[in-house]
């Protein structure tokens, strides 16, 4: 079904939308069976109201841009079954397990997320819609099933910001607020953010069926992912080994992109890793301000397991966990009668795939850093030059985003133009030493300064979702002023553009930003 985007027809959209969400498509995750999920109604929020809405995501889903203004919209996207919600559209929460902070945590699952169905996208793909904060589920454990306004706004803004940075991510259609109180470290108010993704299958889904010794369900899940998202794997000599390779390589590419923009996820547990290699579960994330390779964005991560510099290593480790879960499937088609021999070969094959992670990640990050430095030609010492810059930034706590953005102003021949970026460094002599190396390297390039600057400004964003920017929007939203959420969302749609009217959003963080802390409490 396709929905008209005209204002005249928008009023009729909600009933059709709810009906479409309630009609599972062939091959949808919900059709896998009760072993994979639990169907249950959402717990409606009291007097919900719209905080933010992405007309871009609406367009992707072929929904009218006026949808959020329609009566019943806020109710529908908090899972309220009392309006426009057909009987067959019961939401579901999926079950999975996983490793949290490196320790096996056993069964987890969607503790406050409810998937309400799928919609066809204008790009030919199908997208699941998931309500984060939709209420308690059988997997909530001690939680209340709610999300708070603070974390919901952060996820809404960052999902869309990452998309416009060109980084694979779940999207966000809307965030709905309520005055309903929620107890966290203090009393906050409840909210629901509507996540949008082709799939919400995580590494932890595979770990769950492996740990429960259900190879039949493990295979059913793997077949679902292959048939729907990795059909080329079906033609491989070993489809399940090919699935592991696809997930491993996508994850390596993803984390290289994170590192290149200074993004820290904060909670890289295996249950927060997407089988499609997209960024998922925005919690205590953060973009690095003053560069510190050991930066920890999550206040709860006291050991620094998920620090900026650790992200590639942790992602690789998580792929090992996925490989272990897939071992019962790897090599099945070889027809090896002896179980021990088959298992031994499966381990060898999986290890060979896992060895490709650093082989993929290293060159991917080098390409990204070469683009950030404006180097069109590949030279042997480029990685060393980039690492030396990061070391110099680390020593001076130079701002990550501004440093790379201002590098475009450096001239091949005129050191006096270094001032804008040089001023970001405490140890300016150290910067000068690096800048001389950089200029020498630029002398090998054929592009002139102007052409290089244009290319660099396409690789180095001027605007990222810094914590203090999100905090300002959150504080205003708590006062029912949602204009800053909208303004920030619009700015972050064009992260590489100058936008001189919004220069303040690209400035160094104010002093008070240093006291901001984000944690797993959301």
From Swiss-Prot:
Cystine residue pairs: none
Keywords, sorted A to Z: ATP-binding, Magnesium, Manganese, Metal-binding, Nucleotide-binding, Nucleotidyltransferase, Transferase
Pfam families: SelO (PF02696)
Protein origin, superkingdom: Bacteria
Record-listed ATP binding positions: 109, 111-112, 132, 144-145, 195, 202, 281
Positions of the catalytic residues: 271 (proton acceptor)
Necessary cofactors: Mg(2+); Mn(2+)
GO molecular function, one term: ATP binding
Keyword Disulfide bond tagged: no
Entry binding sites for Mg(2+): 272, 281
The enzyme's E.C. designation: 2.7.7.-, 2.7.7.108
Keyword Membrane annotated: no
Catalysed reactions listed for this entry: L-seryl-[protein] + ATP = 3-O-(5'-adenylyl)-L-seryl-[protein] + diphosphate; L-threonyl-[protein] + ATP = 3-O-(5'-adenylyl)-L-threonyl-[protein] + diphosphate; L-tyrosyl-[protein] + ATP = O-(5'-adenylyl)-L-tyrosyl-[protein] + diphosphate; L-histidyl-[protein] + UTP = N(tele)-(5'-uridylyl)-L-histidyl-[protein] + diphosphate
Record-linked HAMAP family: YdiU_SelO
Family: Belongs to the SELO family.
PANTHER family (UniProt xref): PROTEIN ADENYLYLTRANSFERASE SELO, MITOCHONDRIAL
Role noted for this protein: Nucleotidyltransferase involved in the post-translational modification of proteins. It can catalyze the addition of adenosine monophosphate (AMP) or uridine monophosphate (UMP) to a protein, resulting in modifications known as AMPylation and UMPylation.
Name by which UniProt lists this protein: Protein nucleotidyltransferase YdiU
Organism: Burkholderia cenocepacia (strain ATCC BAA-245 / DSM 16553 / LMG 16656 / NCTC 13227 / J2315 / CF5610)
């Amino acid at each position: 079904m396709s929905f008209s985007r005209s204002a005249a027809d928008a009023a009729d959209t909600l009933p059709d939308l709810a009906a479409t969400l309630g009609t599972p498509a062939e091959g949808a995750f919900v059709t896998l069976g009760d072993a994979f999920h639990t169907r249950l109604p959402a717990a409606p929020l009291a007097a919900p109201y719209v905080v933010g809405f992405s007309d871009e995501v609406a367009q992707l889903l072929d929904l009218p841009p006026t949808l959020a203004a329609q009566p019943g919209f806020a109710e529908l996207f908090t899972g309220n079954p009392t309006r426009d919600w057909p009987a067959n559209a019961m939401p579901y929460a999926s079950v999975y397990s996983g490793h949290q902070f490196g320790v096996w945590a056993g069964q987890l699952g969607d503790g406050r997320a409810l998937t309400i169905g799928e919609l066809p996208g204008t790009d030919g793909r199908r997208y699941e819609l998931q309500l984060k904060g939709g209420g308690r589920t059988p997997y909530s454990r001690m939680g209340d099933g709610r999300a708070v306004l603070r974390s919901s706004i952060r996820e809404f803004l960052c999902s869309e910001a990452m998309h416009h940075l060109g980084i694979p991510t779940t999207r966000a259609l809307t965030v709905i607020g309520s005055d309903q109180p929620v107890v966290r470290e203090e009393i906050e108010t409840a909210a629901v953010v509507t996540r949008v993704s082709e799939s919400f299958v995580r590494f932890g889904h595979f770990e769950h069926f492996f740990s429960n010794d259900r190879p039949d369900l493990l295979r059913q899940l793997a077949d679902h992912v292959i048939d729907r998202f990795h059909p080329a794997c079906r033609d491989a000599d070993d489809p399940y080994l090919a699935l592991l390779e696809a997930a491993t390589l996508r994850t390596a590419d993803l984390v290289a992109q994170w590192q290149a923009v200074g993004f820290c996820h904060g909670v890289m547990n295996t249950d927060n890793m997407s089988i499609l290699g997209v960024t998922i579960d925005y919690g205590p994330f953060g973009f690095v301000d003053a560069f510190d390779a050991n930066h920890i964005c999550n206040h709860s991560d006291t050991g620094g397991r998920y620090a900026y510099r650790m992200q590639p290593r942790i992602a690789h480790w998580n792929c090992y966990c996925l490989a272990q879960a897939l071992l019962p499937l790897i090599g099945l088609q070889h027809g090896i009668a002896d179980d021990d021999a088959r298992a031994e070969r499966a381990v060898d094959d999986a290890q060979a795939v896992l060895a490709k992670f650093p082989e993929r990640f290293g060159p991917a990050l080098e390409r990204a850093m070469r683009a950030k430095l404006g180097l069109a030609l590949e030279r042997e010492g480029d990685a060393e030059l980039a690492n030396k810059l990061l070391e110099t930034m680390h020593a001076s706590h130079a701002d990550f985003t501004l440093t790379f953005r201002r590098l475009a102003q450096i001239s091949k021949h005129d050191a006096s133009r270094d001032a804008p970026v040089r001023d970001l460094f405490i140890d300016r002599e150290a910067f000068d030493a690096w800048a001389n190396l950089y200029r020498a390297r630029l002398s090998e390039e054929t592009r002139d300064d102007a052409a290089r600057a244009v290319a660099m400004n396409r690789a180095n964003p001027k605007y990222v979702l810094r914590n203090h920017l999100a905090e300002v929007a959150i504080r205003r939203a708590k006062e029912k002023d949602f204009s800053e959420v909208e303004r920030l969302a619009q700015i972050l749609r064009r992260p590489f553009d100058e936008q001189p009217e919004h220069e303040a959003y690209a400035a160094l963080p104010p002093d008070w930003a240093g006291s901001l802390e984000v944690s797993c409490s959301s």
